[in-house]
Each structure stands twice: as structure tokens, then as C-alpha cells.
């Protein structure tokens, strides 16, 4: 299963900006592209306390800076069009509504292209293809799983409003699906503290998890 990550925008194409339903602004009229992201979803985006390594100030969280793949992409878009970049931190499940209401011009946040989201906002196209995987503890009976069938009956969770939680976990027979985690770090903590047997996420997030938590395996 592949996860298609997209630039989610209130525009049809970056080169031809038009208004989107839901009251979004028409174009980058002031030369500033405002981009919404969670700023808590490494390696795509995260929060740090300085502007090292090209980090960009988070305009609605003074003193903090955003960095990651999504920030790099946003900077490239702005450089190509002569725009200034402003990053706005937003909760995951508020990103699509933020585009619809014009809170920001675009979302670049590792979100998957789905039919449901495509009915609400425009996509500028995929920028990354990520395999969806499960992460567990190295001493877990699920550590040797090689198929969905091997995960049957396990307790699990994923981040709220993601295809991992809404579409992937329900495919596991007899899965004891726990309440969705509000953030990616909360999802990882649920596994680390033993609240669940495994979590479902994408490969880049999983690779970051096992680097941070040596007792976790993909």
C-alpha cells in the first residue's frame, strides 16, 4: 500500500492561483504564501527553538521555528515565485478546514490524497510516495509479523484523521482499535508506554520512531 503525499492547496496550480470554495483567499496578492502544517510530524515537519538549518519562524507561535521536508518544499515554491514564506502551526484535523476558510493559502504537511479530501480542496499533486507500515516493540509477539493476517487481534492505534486510522487498521481482523492519537508523538507514546501492541504509520515516520526509540521495530 502506498501513501501519496500531496501539496494541499486553495489553488488549482501554483502558477495559476484561483479562489477555492470555503472562502479561501484568491491568490498570493500580498506576495506572502502562508502554509499550514502541524509542526509535529517529523521528518515532514517539526518544531525547534532556533532558525538553524534553514528553519522558518512559526508566525502564530512566537520564538519557535518549523523545519523538515515540508518546510524545504515550501521554501522552494516561494523562491521560484518570488514570495515570502509564512508558516502557521495547525492541529492535524484543522488543516483542511484552514485551507477552506482561508486561514492559510496552502497545506504542505504530508497529507494523503483521498477522494474525500479532493471534494473539499484542490491538490497540486504528489511530492512523495511512502509505504504504510506497522511499528511495534522488539519483544512483542507481533514483531515477526509479515502480513496483515499476522496482526489479527492486536490492540492498535494511529493518528487521528489519517488513512492509517480510518482505512488501514479496520482491515486487521479482530483488531482492538483504540482511540486515535491527536498527534504523531502521542501515537508513538501510546506504543512506548504499552497502551497498544502496535501502531500504523508511514515509513518515514516509522524510521524516525525507531531512531528515537531503540526498542521499537518496523
Named regions from a protein language model:
Residues 69-71, 86-98, 143, 178-193:
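Short helix-initiation/N-cap motifs at beta->coil->alpha
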Residues 48-60, 74-83, 161-182, 211-214:
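Ligand-binding cleft/hinge of the Venus flytrap
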Residues 56, 70, 118-133, 217-218:
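A structural signal for short loop-to-beta-strand junctions that line the ligand-binding cleft
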Residues 1-32:
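Short, low-complexity disordered leader/linker segments with a strong preference
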Amino acid at each position: 500500500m502506498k501513501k501519496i503525499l500531496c501539496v494541499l492547496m486553495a489553488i488549482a496550480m501554483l502558477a495559476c492561483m484561483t479562489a477555492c470554495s470555503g472562502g479561501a483567499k484568491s491568490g498570493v496578492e500580498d506576495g506572502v504564501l502562508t502554509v499550514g502544517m502541524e509542526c509535529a510530524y517529523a521528518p515532514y515537519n517539526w518544531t525547534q527553538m532556533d532558525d538553524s538549518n534553514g528553519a522558518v519562524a512559526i508566525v502564530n507561535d512566537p520564538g519557535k521555528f518549523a523545519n523538515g521536508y515540508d518546510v524545504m518544499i515550501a521554501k522552494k515554491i516561494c523562491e521560484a515565485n518570488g514570495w515570502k514564506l509564512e508558516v502557521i502551526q495547525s492541529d492535524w484535523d484543522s488543516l483542511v478546514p484552514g485551507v477552506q476558510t482561508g486561514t492559510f493559502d496552502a497545506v504542505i504537511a504530508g497529507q494523503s490524497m483521498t477522494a474525500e479530501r479532493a471534494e473539499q480542496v484542490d491538490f497540486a499533486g504528489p511530492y512523495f510516495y511512502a509505504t504504510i507500515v506497522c511499528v511495534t516493540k522488539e519483544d512483542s509477539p507481533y514483531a515477526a509479523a509479515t502480513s496483515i493476517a499476522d496482526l489479527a487481534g492486536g490492540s492498535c492505534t494511529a493518528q487521528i484523521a489519517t488513512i492509517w486510522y480510518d482505512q488501514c487498521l479496520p482491515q486487521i481482523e479482530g483488531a482492538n482499535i483504540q482511540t486515535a492519537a491527536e498527534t504523531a508523538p502521542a501515537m508513538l507514546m501510546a506504543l512506548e508506554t504499552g497502551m497498544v501492541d502496535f501502531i500504523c504509520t508511514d515509513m518515514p515516520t516509522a524510521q524516525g520512531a525507531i531512531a528515537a526509540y531503540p526498542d521499537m521495530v518496523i
